[in-house]
C-alpha cells in the first residue's frame, strides 16, 4: 500500500501574533481529495489554545495542496475547533462572511530575510548606504537572498498556489510576493500556506523570516506591509466614481476596528512616512501610496470598474481576520 505524508498545519493561540504549527499524519492509499482528509486533534495546552486539564483541540481540514518538497507529501490547511466542534476563539477563518466567494483578494506579502548572526537583514549595508537602490534590483551589491525567493516561488507554483509575482523591496534583504484568489477564505489559505513554505525554506538556510512591520525601528528604512487588494461585484462592475468614494468613506468611522486586526506593532510602521498614512488618520486617493486606501489607476482607466487597495495591513497580520474585517 502506498503511504502519503499529510502535514496538518494550523494557527496557534499566541498573542498578539499567531504562529504556524504543523504535524504529520501518515495515510495509506490517500486519494488526494480534501474530503478524504480525516479530522485530527492536538494538544492545545502547548499552543496556548487550551488548559492542561482539557487540552484537546480539533483540526478541521479546509484546504489541500500538494507538497513539492516532500516525497508523497501534502499540506492540509486546517481550522482549529473546540472539542464540541465550535470554532476556537483563535480561528479567524471561521469569522469570514463570504459564502458566495463574491469578494476577491490579492495580498502583497512583504518580509525580510533575517540574518540570525548579525540580527540584521541579509546584506544590510555596513556603510550606511541609504535605501533606494534595492527596490526591484539586480546584482550582488543590491539583491540579497534571491535564491531563497526563487525557490519559494517555484515551490508555490508547483503546489498550485496562485502566486502572481515577486520582487525585491525597498530595503536591503526585503522581498515581496503576491497571491490572488476568488474568495476571501481561499485568499487567506494561499497566504498561510505560502508562508509555511517560506518558513520551511528558512530552516534550510539557517535564517529567520521576519514579518515584524518595522524590524529596523525608527530609522529611515521602510517597514513591511501586506497590502490588501480587494473587490466585490459592485466594485468590479459599478462604473461610478461616486460609488467608489462612498465605499471608501464607509471605512472612515471604523478605522480603529480595522487597525485592531491589521497586525501588531503597526503603529511603528504607519507613521505617515515611507509610503504610509498615519495610523491616526484616514485618507484615500487615486494612485496615492501615502493614503490609507489607494484607488489604483487601472481601476480609474477602466471607468471605475476594478478594485481598491487597503495599504494599512501589516506584514504580520492574519489574512483571514483582515479579509473578514474588510468584508
How should these model regions be labeled?
Residues 1-327:
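Glycine-rich, acidic/polar active-site loops that bind/position phosphate-bearing ligands
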